[in-house]
Amino acid sequence: QPPTENGENEEAVTKMMYMERRDADGNIVGLLDEGLWFKQGDEAPYTGLVVGMNKPKDGKPPEFPYNYKREFQDGVQVGVETGWYTTGKKRIELVYENGEVVSMRQWDADGNELKED
């Protein structure tokens, strides 16, 4: 990322609605197909955060602004993906390595971790 005025690198952030997955030939493919993630209109695979925002309800802002956060490096999902309930309590946490999920944790709306059977 280019440095900001104070010389630090600023991380890119976008919304999923502005992202697309492309195959090796540059064709847009489905979400589950093989390919790299790009911000629409960009030539290079995306590096940065992708966030989902909770929408206002009944004209009031949401209690918690985000419903998920994902991290991408050179078009591949990496790091921790976190999903939240509208209250701000954690709903799910997925850990990615090279685009593959390597671990997952889930919580109920009260914040209790759900155990796998």
Describe each PLM feature range.
Residues 1-117:
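Glycine/tyrosine- and acidic-biased, solvent-exposed loop/turn segments at the edges of beta-strands
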